[in-house]
Design a protein with these regions (language model features):
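N-terminal export and membrane-targeting signals
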Residues: 1-17, 156
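Non-catalytic cap/lid and distal C-terminal segments of serine-dependent acyl enzymes
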Residues: 9-10, 24-328
Length: 328
């Protein structure tokens, strides 16, 4: 109980007040970047239509101290309904990838081609872990404050949101849902890092990802032995109690080669670890009597064919939670 109380106090420090919407959202997206700013001065400095419905935004972010990219897929009725506000689906990338990964590796553009939802795929750094670092970038502020406000003020994003992510992005989806109650109506994790302190191996995976990208691993959440409460405040399993009321979907394999792997594929340690972390979170949710849709599908590696399959499997639930009927 003491740990939960301390975590709640830590969360209180990042509780966000949802900003009011401003008038004057645009009807046509082509052309110059929209002249809107977030409360802290973050702004879209350029936008590029890179494919049908696909818009890349370059954002000057005070939270990060640099520019960052976000890719959005516009709803198919964007132009036909110039005053509409759109439900939002955030898709979070994994370690060592970027904001282009979902459109590059999956059929998400086709999947959402008949569905009136704004799909948002933000940059999170190769090792950002969807967190405000103790010493470094403030990714959580960038995503949940700056980007959210810019989308609401310039790109007609509404107040109903779902979020999903793979690997490191699975941690982000569940962390953001737990740390900002009510911001997201549904969350999904595919092979997610859902218990970063499950074992020394789990801790080492986080610190090795950070150090392999040239950063001090203690700059993220501190020394895990000396600052366990900071780690707990960013660990989905420790935050599970705050997920009550959010529609949840969790999926992972066990690292053994499965039906979507090519011949000769070997055992995958990353998915084995993330499968164990996912199982631990599922056990915690059951202990707390928090419902979730669970797909612990056994053989399967830490790879895109499984993540795309689970995106399809979770898509109807994610859309239903934000009041959208998907076209299939």
């Amino acid at each position: 109980m003491r740990t939960r109380a301390v975590i709640l106090r830590l969360l209180a420090g990042v509780t966000l007040v949802v900003a009011g919407l401003v008038a004057g959202s645009v009807a046509s997206i082509a052309g110059a970047a929209q002249q809107v700013t977030a409360d802290d001065g973050a702004t879209v400095i350029s936008q590029t239509m890179v494919a049908p419905r696909t818009l890349d935004l370059t954002i000057q972010s005070p939270a990060l101290g640099r520019t960052a990219m976000t890719r959005i897929l516009l709803p198919p009725d964007w132009d036909a309904r110039p005053s509409a506000r759109w439900p939002v689906l955030y898709l979070l990338h994994g370690c060592c990838d970027d904001y282009t990964s979902w459109t590059r590796q999956t059929d998400v553009a086709a999947l959402t081609g008949g569905t009136d939802v704004l799909v948002v795929m933000p940059e999170a750094g190769p090792d950002g872990y969807y967190s405000n670092w103790l010493s470094g970038p403030a990714w959580e502020t960038f995503h949940t404050v700056e980007l959210r406000q810019l989308l609401e003020r310039g790109y007609r994003a509404g107040q109903r949101r779902a979020i999903a992510g793979l690997s490191m992005g699975g941690l982000g989806a569940f962390d953001y849902s737990a740390r900002h109650p009510g911001m997201f109506q549904a969350a999904a994790s595919y092979g997610g890092a859902l218990d970063t302190t499950l074992s020394q191996e789990a801790i080492d995976q986080v610190t090795s990802v950070v150090s392999s990208n040239g950063h001090d691993p203690n700059a993220l959440w501190g020394d895990p032995a000396k600052q366990p409460l900071v780690w707990a405040a960013h660990n989905p399993l420790d935050l599970a109690f705050a997920l009550r009321g959010t529609k949840l979907f969790v999926a992972a394999g066990n690292g053994q080669p499965g039906p979507l792997d090519p011949p000769g594929t070997g055992f995958n340690e990353s998915e084995a670890l993330h499968g164990a972390e996912t199982s631990a979170l599922v056990d915690r949710l059951r202990l707390l009597h928090i419902p979730a849709t669970v797909d612990l599908y056994g053989p399967g590696t830490h790879s895109w064919p499984y993540w795309q399959r689970e995106l399809h499997a979770s898509f109807p639930m994610l859309m239903a939670a934000i009041g959208v009927t998907p076209m299939v």
